[in-house]
From Swiss-Prot:
InterPro entries: Etherase_MurQ (IPR005488), Glucokinase_regulatory_CS (IPR005486), MURQ/GCKR (IPR040190), SIS_dom (IPR001347), SIS_dom_sf (IPR046348), UBA-like_sf (IPR009060). It catalyses: N-acetyl-D-muramate 6-phosphate + H2O = N-acetyl-D-glucosamine 6-phosphate + (R)-lactate. Transmembrane segments: none annotated. A lyase-type mechanism (elimination/hydration) is suggested for the cleavage of the lactyl ether bond of MurNAc 6-phosphate, with the formation of an alpha,beta-unsaturated aldehyde intermediate with (E)-stereochemistry, followed by the syn addition of water to give product. Pfam families: GKRP-like_C, GKRP_SIS_N. It comes from Enterobacter sp. (strain 638). This is N-acetylmuramic acid 6-phosphate etherase. The lineage of its organism: Bacteria, Pseudomonadati, Pseudomonadota, Gammaproteobacteria, Enterobacterales. Homodimer. GO terms for molecular function: carbohydrate derivative binding; carbon-oxygen lyase activity; ether hydrolase activity. Belongs to the GCKR-like family. MurNAc-6-P etherase subfamily. Induction: Induced by MurNAc 6-phosphate that releases the repressor MurR from the DNA. Repressed by MurR in the absence of MurNAc 6-phosphate. The keyword Lyase applies.
Amino acid sequence: MNLGSLVSESRNPQTMDLDALSTFDLVTRFNQQDTLVALAVKETLPEVAKAVDAATDALKSGGRIIYMGAGTSGRLGVLDASECPPTFGVPHGLVLGLIAGGPGALLKAVEGAEDNQQLGADDLIAIHLTANDLVVGLAASGRTPYVIGGLEYAKQLGCTTVAISCNPVSPIAQVAAIAISPVVGPEALTGSTRLKSGTAQKLVLNMISTGAMVKFGKVYQNLMVDMQATNIKLVDRACRMVVQATGASREEAEAALKQTDHDVKPAILMILSGLDAAAARAKLDAHQGFLRAALEN
């Protein structure tokens, strides 16, 4: 592949004079480029929706969501995965991020790791990948060997696969069952795909993980009702969520949360249904943790 022919590696005619601009004009130029990102992502929404449904299916079948990438792409996957346990109360590892070169590559590049196709497969073997898992490969260029190797192994195992890249008709898009390719155009700084490409990938990951968790019963209305209240800020947020969902007073919300060990979902059900904590938990269990279903049935 001629790397210079990739959109993500080409020069941007709107930013040829970066080194001659005033500071304000410099940041304005970057901002102008960033406005293109959401529009590019919008064009991929049908594929993003398919990825959300695939992620939901994986979770409901007892599988995991696995992100894998190199460099910025890998770091973004690790970031999104690491936010899921505190936000949605899911176990660590249910959403997992793999980066070429291992955890050390989060802080310092591991030379050659992204060019090792077998390493992608080996990393998935090491986490005992199963056919129930969803594997999402991230590569701005769309041709990272580490990601291709991982996607090919996952495909052989029977996993549903997703590719997220910022070049059209990329190699990883051709390997994966679902291809999400927001074409954001040349970067403001030539080839620096941590910029628009990274932003586009983050927007897509936001939708995949959050959308899947909504459809997995971790959200009521637009409230993260399975959030873990692990610090003062989150304890306060838990109380506010109960108030917002029920219309109860803060005192009533605090009393309910005290009985549920600050577990928001049963506290809401207690107030709206008149159940005690044990009965609220039992009813939630009977409805697979879906608060709306527990309230309506």
